Amino acid sequence: MYNILKKSFYKQKSLDVASSLLGKMLLFNQHKGIITETEAYIGQDDQAAHSFHGYTKRTAVMFGNPGFSYVYLIYGMYHCLNVVTEPEGFPAAILIRSIILLSKNTPHTKVNGPGKICKILHITKEHNNIDMTANHSFCICDTNLNIDDYICTPRIGISKATDKFWRLVIPNVTSLQYIDTKLVCTLT
């Protein structure tokens, strides 16, 4: 059994959560993937965040409990998975931008882009506002990976608040191996 990240993990400052999510395992039904890239959207002052325009039906989950999923549709066709961070009442979420999809039967596949992740895993708006700290089929779990080597860059695909270096990426991920239920990450 995997150790699901607790609400206290997500209740921290968003940039701390964004960096700590690197190397953690996203579980969705039968799919498993190691998170290799995240992006933070923090508060009502962040012009690129959905919460910038305040509390709405769409953004209500961002103002809610930490550790809940925030799934929305962009361009009318791509779903994006975020996890809510910070204490309840402060709107913030971390976008999962890239994973290494783990499979025992096929080579591990790097999945770049939040829309691709949701398409491959079959995550839709139906999976919005789910407590990922209490759901064994849709959660993020701890691993034995300690990722200290990551880079911060400007966020991608936005036109406002482009000066924020809130995209966190594990550089040069070359392979992930699944060995006796323990994960080993090889970085170059």
Curated annotation (Swiss-Prot):
GO biological process: base-excision repair
SUPFAM superfamilies hit by this protein: FMT C-terminal domain-like (SSF50486)
Enzyme class: hydrolase
EC number(s) from the headed UniProt entry: 3.2.2.-
Gene3D superfamilies found in the cross-reference section: Methylpurine-DNA glycosylase (MPG)
GO molecular function, one term: alkylbase DNA N-glycosylase activity
InterPro entries with a match to the protein in the record: Formyl_transferase-like_C_sf, MPG, MPG_sf
The UniProt record lists the keyword Hydrolase: yes
Entry annotated with the keyword DNA damage: yes
Record key words, sorted: DNA damage, DNA repair, Hydrolase
HAMAP family xrefs: 3MGH
Family: Belongs to the DNA glycosylase MPG family.
Protein name (Swiss-Prot/TrEMBL): Putative 3-methyladenine DNA glycosylase
Species for this entry: Ehrlichia ruminantium (strain Gardel)
Native organism taxonomy: Bacteria, Pseudomonadati, Pseudomonadota, Alphaproteobacteria, Rickettsiales
